[in-house]
Structure formats: structure tokens, C-alpha cells
Swiss-Prot record:
Membrane topology type: Lipid-anchor
Swiss-Prot/TrEMBL GO biological process terms: autophagy; protein transport
Compartments (UniProt record): Cytoplasmic vesicle, Cvt vesicle membrane; Cytoplasmic vesicle, Autophagosome membrane; Vacuole membrane
Keywords: Autophagy, Cytoplasmic vesicle, Lipoprotein, Membrane, Protein transport, Transport, Ubl conjugation pathway, Vacuole
Protein name from the UniProt record: Autophagy-related protein 8
Organism: Gibberella zeae (strain ATCC MYA-4620 / CBS 123657 / FGSC 9075 / NRRL 31084 / PH-1)
Pfam families: ATG8 (PF02991)
Domain of life: Eukaryota
GO cellular component terms, A-Z: autophagosome membrane; Cvt vesicle membrane
Purpose: Ubiquitin-like modifier involved in cytoplasm to vacuole transport (Cvt) vesicles and autophagosome formation. With ATG4, mediates the delivery of the vesicles and autophagosomes to the vacuole via the microtubule cytoskeleton. Required for selective autophagic degradation of the nucleus (nucleophagy) as well as for mitophagy which contributes to regulate mitochondrial quantity and quality by eliminating the mitochondria to a basal level to fulfill cellular energy requirements and preventing excess ROS production.
Gene null: resulting phenotype: Significantly decreases the radial growth of colonies under nutrient-rich conditions. Strongly reduces conidiation. Also reduces strongly the production of deoxynivalenol (DON), an important virulence determinant.
Amino acid sequence: MRSKFKDEHPFEKRKAEAERIRQKYADRIPVICEKVEKSDIATIDKKKYLVPADLTVGQFVYVIRKRIKLSPEKAIFIFVDEVLPPTAALMSSIYEEHKDEDGFLYITYSGENTFGEA
């Protein structure tokens, strides 16, 4: 999936910003979180996050659920490089494995109703 953030900001600018963030906040991870294009789930109000390195994927999902005001019966799935990361994995390990060459970790999210309602 193409990242709108990548389309809107040139590589050099993204790389410089990620480096600045990592220098200033060594214990934080710069994350870009965007909705999967064809998903009917709510669009998030901000794309850029500075996530504590010791946060788990599950805890990050909770943050996203809150930001999009997702009701408890709705499912949300997050993807890193189009793969579901393990819920218990630390964001720091996901970052080390999947960070983009610009220094950001790109996460996409999608949803479906777990009870099959339209």
C-alpha cells in the first residue's frame, strides 16, 4: 500500500525528521499510522506518533482504537509491511525489523465487524 505520508513529504525531509526525533527522544519510536484505503473503519485524526519503545503492539492497538473511537464489538487489525505483527511484540523490536529507510515505522490499520453486521 502506498503511504499518503510518503507521497506528501519528500524522502530527505522525512529522513531528517526521523533522525531529529530519534536524537531528541532516544526511547521513543517515530510511527506513521494510516488507514488501509478500502477499509470502512474510521480515519484516524493524526498520522504521526511518538511511541514508547517498551510499548507492546497490543497497547498501540488500544491507542489507535481510542483515537478513532472504535466501539468494543468492532475489530481492528494493524499491519506492518502487510503482515499482522504479534500482539505481545514490543514496538522497539517491530521498529528494528521493519523501519523504513527514512527512519519511520509505517503501520496501516483496517477493520471489520466481528459480528458480521453490515
